[in-house]
Amino acid sequence: MSDSWQTYKDNSEPFSPPENNQWITVEGVIPPNTTPILKRRYISNKCLSTHNTAGGAIYHTPRHQGDDVNISVNPTTGYFKEKIPLQGGGWCQWHINTIVFVIMYTDVNHLIKDAVPYTGTGITIYINDSEKPKEMKKFTNYINYKPIIYPFLRKDYDTPNQIGLYGESGGTTSFGLSLIPGSEWKITYMPTLDETKMPKIIVSENPPGIYPRGNARVEYPDGKIDLNRDSIDYWKINNTSQWE
């Protein structure tokens, strides 16, 4: 079956989760001055994409499609709760593959005046048999993740100060989630934001004619400095053991 025919059928009978479905609950509480982003990605083993190897051989891979989910957050408590359908329906028979939940700052002036929000942190959940990183924790039916996260400052010589959020894995922490039919499925994400500790990535300008133009270092809350790097070690923020 050609790619164009599959695309035609997908457009004529598009992604449309059936009402008679199973659902994954995503809930939690986000800190003040942050906003959530919830993404869901579906996979189809019926609709395939065609590829060619360098030697001319043809092979096929599953198609993917995803979208953002509008989230309603309680403005007082920060609580949110959304449901993600297991099946996406449509001619392609979409089913859930990954769920990504990220929080980002909306305002950082309480930390540094005139700084701007930067990157966020959160979780990436790989459902059932989806391709996943080798090194990650795996759960069945339920994930309850309550990390401590921190603000971090990125100070570049040629851009305004930027403040992002940093978690255990930097951006998103990955988990595998196996779903047993007939069980309740839930993902709970309740981070604690500790704004008393803020590591800094500082990129200063080298003299003209010296490459690279920027010279980076990382400064930690306890005064430690890592030279010639622009990435943060999470365990150093709170001055704990790397293996805790």
Functional labels for PLM-detected ranges:
Residues 4-25, 32-33, 40, 229-232, ...:
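Beta-strand-rich domain onsets/edges
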Residues 15-17, 21, 29-31, 87-97:
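Short, surface-exposed loop and linker segments with low hydrophobicity and enrichment for Pro/Ser/Thr
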Residues 20-24, 34-36, 78, 97, ...:
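Residues at beta-strand starts and edge strands
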Residues 26-27, 69, 172-176:
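Intrinsically disordered, low-complexity boundary segments flanking structured domains
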Residues 27-31, 41, 72-76, 83-87, ...:
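A structural detector for beta-sheet-dominated domains
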Residues 36-151:
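Structured domain cores in non-transmembrane regions
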Residues 122-244:
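A eukaryote-biased signal for long
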